[in-house]
Amino acid sequence: MALLRVLCLLAALRRSLCTDTEERLVEYLLDPTRYNKLIRPATNGSQLVTVQLMVSLAQLISVHEREQIMTTNVWLTQEWEDYRLTWKPEDFDNMKKVRLPSKHIWLPDVVLYNNADGMYEVSFYSNAVISYDGSIFWLPPAIYKSACKIEVKHFPFDQQNCTMKFRSWTYDRTEIDLVLKSEVASLDDFTPSGEWDIVALPGRRNENPDDSTYVDITYDFIIRRKPLFYTINLIIPCILITSLAILVFYLPSDCGEKMTLCISVLLALTVFLLLISKIVPPTSLDVPLVGKYLMFTMVLVTFSIVTSVCVLNVHHRSPTTHTMPPWVRTLFLRKLPALLFMKQPQQNCARQRLRQRRQTQERAAAATLFLRAGARACACYANPGAAKAEGLNGYRERQGQGPDPPAPCGCGLEEAVEGVRFIADHMRSEDDDQSVSEDWKYVAMVIDRLFLWIFVFVCVFGTVGMFLQPLFQNYATNSLLQLGQGTPTSK
């Protein structure tokens, strides 16, 4: 028990000595008589202070397309040497490292030059790790809002290149030399984003040939958008609305809803166009891919409205207003239906058989009426005695007598025949007019089917052509980036 007390006492004494040692070391390093944090750590005015810089991306918070701002959470690693912050470890119980508040030592005041919100400094001034040889390691976290030029050409299958430029605010190259610690930014503690994929984070050191005092460190944040959200909520509804525009040509003209469907589709596309205008930045340099597709669809819908008006005009034509040209009959009634997989009604259909039967009945009724009228006329002028002896059919002309005088009631017979002929001609004319009207309706149906196939091919190839182009372009860009990362670069 006594031994345990002795060990505890020794441990407490050692901790006290260590605390006293660290306190003595801090007081020694920050002694105002030997250290001034406002003075650059150089022995003379021509000596350069080399600052090694590296960015570690912790989180890609957001990319605001309309304001063209990228918000990131980064850790800014900075390393340099200060000859004034050196000591001999043997004088301080072999203590080789100490942590000092960063605001109590000299800092290279590296800031984000392309800042977008006025917060150029880091978010938190963490402690700096000082080694006995004077090397300083400082890792402050920061949330930066940097300006980013958004390329909307392939939205939502776009890939952006947002840069972050770091430079000392007050020191130039004759006093501080910024050096890249690593060619790429670190992703060791990165939290994946739900909207963007990190393609590459290369860094480079920039110098100005015209200005020997200029130097900066620039990191390129090459990011690719995850298009699933916009595909589900924007592109697929647009494609479905386009399919409704195609179905306009499959809708029968007699239903009277062609124009209603066309206008409804056009209004729906206008609403989607307004949604896109609130997402993408108001730039006149490029039109987003979805905007191009919507404009393409709106042009098709507008054209479908024009063609629907023409189809309805053809559908409601009649022989009293229009005459069908021979080329229309040849093209739209004989040739195009076979090419468009339309089966034209045959001549022996039920309606044609009914029409022939009606014509046969009309001829039979006219013949019966004619025979009845002729029989009554002959019975009026026949001799009753002769009729009994010879009959009406045995009536013969007497020799020596002239021809019989004209029958007084022949005019009635002619009027009856003319009336029957007029009725037959009128019914035949109505039947012919109805046949021509049905031909016009069939021509309208052929035009509808023709534009249906045209719209199907245009929409399919237009959609595939528009949305495959950015995918191939992103693939080519990624291949070039991989080749560039595999090739060593010179600083």
From Swiss-Prot:
Regulation: Activated by a myriad of ligands such as acetylcholine, cytisine, nicotine, choline and epibatidine. nAChR activity is inhibited by the antagonist alpha-conotoxins BuIA, PnIA, PnIC, GID and MII, small disulfide-constrained peptides from cone snails.
Molecular function per GO: acetylcholine binding; acetylcholine receptor activity; acetylcholine-gated monoatomic cation-selective channel activity
Reaction(s) catalysed by this chain's protein: Ca(2+)(in) = Ca(2+)(out); K(+)(in) = K(+)(out); Na(+)(in) = Na(+)(out)
Subcellular location: Synaptic cell membrane; Cell membrane
S-S bridge residues: 148-162
Keyword Iron: no
Chain coiled-coil ranges: none
Keywords per UniProt: Cell membrane, Disulfide bond, Glycoprotein, Ion channel, Ion transport, Ligand-gated ion channel, Membrane, Receptor, Signal, Synapse, Transmembrane, Transmembrane helix, Transport
TM regions (residue ranges): 227-251, 259-277, 293-314, 450-468
Site (Key residue that may interfere with effective access of the conotoxin BuIA to the channel binding site): 77
Cellular-component GO terms for this entry: acetylcholine-gated channel complex; axon; cation channel complex; cytoplasm; dendrite; neuron projection; neurotransmitter receptor complex; perikaryon
Glycosylation sites: 44, 161
The protein's role, per its UniProt record: Component of neuronal acetylcholine receptors (nAChRs) that function as pentameric, ligand-gated cation channels with high calcium permeability among other activities. nAChRs are excitatory neurotrasnmitter receptors formed by a collection of nAChR subunits known to mediate synaptic transmission in the nervous system and the neuromuscular junction. Each nAchR subunit confers differential attributes to channel properties, including activation, deactivation and desensitization kinetics, pH sensitivity, cation permeability, and binding to allosteric modulators.
Subunit annotation: Neuronal AChR is a heteropentamer composed of two different types of subunits: alpha and beta. CHRNB2/Beta-2 subunit can be combined to CHRNA2/alpha-2, CHRNA3/alpha-3 or CHRNA4/alpha-4, CHRNA5/alpha-5, CHRNA6/alpha-6 and CHRNB3/beta-3 to give rise to functional receptors.
Family membership noted in the UniProt record: Belongs to the ligand-gated ion channel (TC 1.A.9) family. Acetylcholine receptor (TC 1.A.9.1) subfamily. Beta-2/CHRNB2 sub-subfamily.
Protein name according to UniProt: Neuronal acetylcholine receptor subunit beta-2
Organism annotation: Gallus gallus
